[in-house]
Design a protein with these regions (language model features):
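Mixed-charge (Asp/Glu-Lys/Arg
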Residues: 1-12, 17-143
Length: 143
């Protein structure tokens, strides 16, 4: 089996540490009841400004694309939660695609607040990773 321990407090990028077979695996957990998962585009992308115009120079190389994310869609009733398990690289690719598309649509200038880098992704964007527990098991040498 897997032993998992949550972290209380502010540990960057790690909410749970899983351990099995002499291997440990940091896991980032995001939970939501409805809506979207908000984040900051600057975390995932290299964004610079030319006045109010945002220019994406590419994906940030500071990101650990292999960090495991578990997105929990909390159900209405006990036992109805959905789990989506994927690498942080999936999030970075989604943010890159959608953020670029949005900036292209608005000629590089965010309509409400040109300086914001707020962005989000949705459960529908990661539905293919539902119950993808094998990602964790493989990383812990349990395959």
């Amino acid at each position: 089996g897997v032993v998992a321990t949550p972290f209380a407090g502010n540990v960057p990028d790690i909410d749970v540490l899983a351990y099995a077979n002499g291997k440990s695996l940091p896991i980032q957990v995001k939970a939501l009841r409805k809506g979207e998962i908000s984040t900051n585009g600057n975390i995932y992308l290299d964004i610079r400004f030319d006045g109010d115009t945002q220019i994406i120079d590419g994906k940030s190389e500071e990101i650990d694309r292999e960090l495991v994310f578990v997105l929990v869609k909390i159900g209405k009733h006990y036992g109805e939660d959905d789990f989506f398990i994927f690498n942080q690289g999936v999030v970075q690719d989604l943010i890159f695609r959608e953020y670029s598309k949005f900036l292209d649509k608005h000629n590089g200038i965010r309509p409400r607040n040109p300086r914001t880098t707020h962005c989000a992704y949705h459960v529908k964007d990661v539905v293919e990773y539902r119950d993808n527990w094998d990602l964790i098991f493989e990383r812990l040498g349990m395959d």
